[in-house]
UniProtKB/Swiss-Prot annotation:
Protein name as catalogued: Cadherin-10
Sorted UniProt keywords: Calcium, Cell adhesion, Cell membrane, Cleavage on pair of basic residues, Glycoprotein, Membrane, Metal-binding, Repeat, Signal, Transmembrane, Transmembrane helix
SUPFAM superfamilies documented for this protein: Cadherin-like
Extracellular face of the membrane: 55-606
Claim: Thylakoid is one of the keywords in the record: no
Originating species: Gallus gallus (Chicken)
Propeptide stretch(es), residue numbers: 23-54
GO cellular component: adherens junction; catenin complex; glutamatergic synapse
One biological process term in Gene Ontology: homophilic cell adhesion via plasma membrane adhesion molecules
Gene transcribed to yield this protein: CDH10
Subcellular location(s) per record: Cell membrane
Length: 789
């Protein structure tokens, strides 16, 4: 028997079973009912199935939802035993939907549904029925309550709350690992038939995932799914009611599943050998290059730690891991030298920092590579034999004495001669010099420890073939002390002796200082240059001495001052000594030795003024002198009224000739005769508001006879101003309206141009600005001139 035949038989059986199911649907269950009512039920075709007699249950009617017929759907029939069939009774219906959703025939008691009913909106309706006498309107039967229950049909498909689900599961998970659970709901009645019984199935996503039919739990179906091969999966789940049988309704949803990463891949170097280059002049800490091991994992599972585990350059280089790029940066640890070593080999290891113990069986999660670093030769500057030099020299050495030698060499393979020099910024007084060839430092000026005990020099070494690459080294010169300074009095002593002093009386304690600094400390000796009958010196042997009197009584009227030479010597080699003169005044003292007066003519001197009084007197004198000088200057100043108050004419030199007298000989204006002096004529005048870029040498031009020079001079100035209208006027204006003797410059009639003023139009001068207003008034008189004439 074929599948088609089986399906045909199944359909035939279901068709034959349908009327029986309908009849059972409307069958009433036995129950007590109000006396006198008889209920009739009908099938889907509206025909009466049977008549229920008294004692049968009639208070439940059953109605299929979603009726699609054109007529009202028949629900059932109410009938009373009091009904004779003559129309004397009237059936009344009240309750849920009465009169709108459900109507009753008043004469026959037939109940109909006026529209299609959805069980999902309401599953049952409670109504009340009553039979009354049509004429008296009195009930013939007590009111009875009944229920119309809506029978469900499979008219709702299962639905998922989410249209798209997102889930994740670790890669390499075992078969059956739960991923996510999806749940669908069906609005049909779960207590009636299989309309709400849902079965889940997978439409897309096999063979990677499966779903449990009853629960909707999605599980992995394949072992060792690798994220590195495929990361995203889309699974379509179907939910079907009727227990998944044919004819059931279904709904679908999409589940996007992502495989999350686990550390199942070790790091791998793409190359077994990596070559890097670095110049030998690179300082410590310079990055040489980066290496990177690739890891197919992501996130913390791909984090790698780099380290140098072997090689001949483990002490010369370091490697640092950069977390953001997961690269290993190799840096210089110690200075490199091409001439010492040119190639280094390192063995670098990369290892995962987070290892999952579940995947130890996949092998060690680390890898190694060989890094070869080539040192490149560069033209290095000279290298000194020391990082600094310290020379000690006595301050009394002769000029030109060598105090020390610095040494430097060219570290390159092709060694070049070295040239030495001193940085003069460190030896401004030029006390030292250096031999440029051998680096010997010698003195060029005398040394003095007392002026400067240390000299900090900077020596520069450069290759003769390449003077740009230089190296500096500090040289510290310490000046050693020699005993070249004699001791002196520590301070100036104002010593006096009382007239009533006695022999052996202490009048002064003296001490000395020495600029030298001997190793054993300073020791001074005090003595008198010659035996003195009045005073003596007693050495205290602690670098101090006492001045004592040798006799009784002194008179300031006889001798007011004594000079006592004291010899001070040191104990260093060679011994230095000096003689200091101590001035001792004779003073009058009281009985306790307090000085009262030290000058014999003190009583004859007038009382002196204090310092403050003297300063006040001087200030008064200065103020009086200043006032007198200012008054004299103001008296001599003459106030001159300007002829022209225009701000634009501040550069003009205007002289007024309105006095009567000898004519131009009495004026202070410049002599026009100088225009005929060839020495005073310049080829070109510079504008005053422009700073000349170059200096022009005056050029002499041959003088022209008569008035040609004046004409050429004026034409030249006019040409300059015509070609540069923005320049201020350079020439000075003077009016020559003289009476008296003839001018030594002869007649000015030669300055007259070939045309009259009427032929010229100088109105454009007014458009050049306020600086040319005066010229516009001179040359462009216009109507004012005509009116004046």
């Amino acid at each position: 028997m074929t599948i088609q035949q089986v399906l045909l038989l199944l359909l035939l059986w279901m068709w034959l079973l349908h009327p029986c199911r309908t009849e059972m649907l409307f069958r009433r269950t036995p129950d007590l009912r109000p006396k006198g009512f008889v209920g009739r039920t009908s099938g889907s075709d509206g025909k009466a199935l049977h008549r229920q007699k008294r004692g049968w249950m009639w208070n439940q009617f059953f109605l299929l939802e979603e009726y699609t017929g054109s007529d009202y759907q028949y629900v059932g029939k109410l009938h009373s035993d009091q009904d004779k069939g003559d129309g004397s009774l009237k059936y009344i219906l009240s309750g849920d939907g009465a009169g709108t959703l459900f109507i009753i025939d008043e004469k026959t008691g037939d109940i109909h549904a006026t529209r299609r009913i959805d069980r999902e909106e309401k599953a049952f309706y409670t109504l009340r029925a009553q039979a009354i006498n049509r004429r008296t309107l009195r009930p013939v039967e007590p009111e009875s309550e009944f229920v119309i229950k809506i029978h469900d049909i499979n008219d709702n498909e299962p639905t998922f709350p989410e249209e798209i689900y997102t889930a994740s599961v670790p890669e390499m998970s075992v078969v059956g690992t739960s991923v996510v659970q999806v749940t669908a709901t069906d609005a049909d009645d779960p207590s009636y038939g299989n309309s709400a019984r849902i079965i889940y199935s997978i439409l897309q996503g096999q063979p990677y995932f499966s779903v449990e039919p009853e629960t909707g739990i999605i599980r992995t179906a394949l072992p060792n799914m690798n994220r590195e091969n495929r990361e995203q999966y889309q699974v379509v789940i179907q939910a079907k009611d009727m227990g998944g049988q044919m004819g059931g309704l279904s709904g679908t949803t999409t589940v996007n599943i992502t495989l999350t990463d686990v550390n199942d891949n070790p790091p791998r170097f793409p190359q077994s050998t990596i070559h890097l280059r670095i110049p030998e002049s690179s300082p410590v800490g310079t990055p040489i290059g980066s290496i990177k091991a690739t890891d197919a994992d992501t996130g913390k599972n791909a984090e790698v730690e780099y380290r140098i585990i072997d090689g001949d350059g483990t002490d010369m280089f370091d490697i640092v891991t950069q977390r953001d790029t997961q690269e290993g940066i190799i840096t210089v640890r110690k200075p490199l030298d091409y001439e010492t070593r040119r190639l280094y080999t390192l063995k670098v290891e990369a290892e995962n920092t987070h290892v999952d113990p579940r995947f130890y069986y996949l092998g060690p999660f680390k890898d190694t590579t060989i890094v070869k670093i080539s040192v490149e030769d560069v033209d290095e500057p000279p290298v000194f034999s020391r990082s600094s030099y310290l020379f000690e020299v006595h301050e009394d050495i002769e000029l030109g004495t060598i105090i020390g030698t610095v040494m430097a060499r060219d570290p390159d393979s092709a060694s070049s001669p070295i040239r030495f020099s001193l940085d003069r910024h460190t030896d401004l007084d030029r006390i030292f010099n250096i031999h440029s060839g051998n680096g010997s430092i010698y003195t060029s000026k005398p040394l003095d420890r007392e002026i400067s005990q240390w000299h900090n020099l900077s020596v520069i070494a450069a290759e003769i073939n390449n003077l740009k690459d230089t190296t500096r080294v500090p040289v510290y010169v310490r000046i050693l002390d020699v005993n070249d300074n004699a001791p002196q009095f520590a301070v100036f002593y104002d010593t006096f002796v009382c007239e009533n002093a006695r022999a052996g009386q202490l009048i002064q304690t003296i001490s000395a200082v020495d600029k030298d600094d001997p190793l054993g400390g300073q020791k001074f000796f005090f003595s008198l240059a010659a035996v003195n009958p009045n005073f003596t010196v007693q050495d205290n042997e602690d670098n101090t001495a006492r001045i004592l009197t040798r006799r009784n009584g002194f008179s300031r009227h006889e001798i007011s001052t004594y000079l006592l030479p004291v010899v001070i010597s040191d104990n260093d080699y060679p011994i230095q000594s000096s003689t200091g003169t101590l001035t001792i005044r004779v003073c009058a003292c009281d009985s306790r030795g307090n000085m009262q007066s030290c000058n014999a003519e003190a009583l004859l001197l007038p009382a002196g003024l204090s310092t403050g009084a003297l300063i006040a007197i001087l200030l008064c004198i200065i103020i009086l002198l200043v006032i007198v000088v200012l008054f004299a200057a103001l008296k001599r100043q003459r106030k001159k009224e300007p002829l022209i108050l225009s701000k634009e004419d501040i550069r003009d030199n205007i002289v007024s000739y309105n006095d009567e007298g000898g004519g131009e000989e009495d004026t202070q204006a410049f002599d026009i005769g100088t225009l005929r002096n060839p020495a005073a004529i310049e080829d070109k005048k510079l504008r005053r508001d422009i700073i000349p870029e170059t200096l022009f040498v005056p050029r002499r031009t041959p003088s022209a006879p008569d008035n040609t020079d004046v004409r050429d001079f004026i034409n030249q100035r006019l040409k300059e101003h015509d070609s540069d209208p923005s320049a201020p006027p350079y020439d000075s204006l003077a009016t020559y309206a003289y009476e008296g003797n003839d001018s030594i410059a002869e007649s000015l009639s030669s300055l007259e141009s070939g045309t009259t003023e009427g032929d010229q139009n100088y109105d454009y001068l007014r458009e050049w600005g306020p600086r040319f207003n005066k010229l516009a008034e001179m040359y462009g008189g216009g109507e004012s001139d005509k009116d004046a004439s």
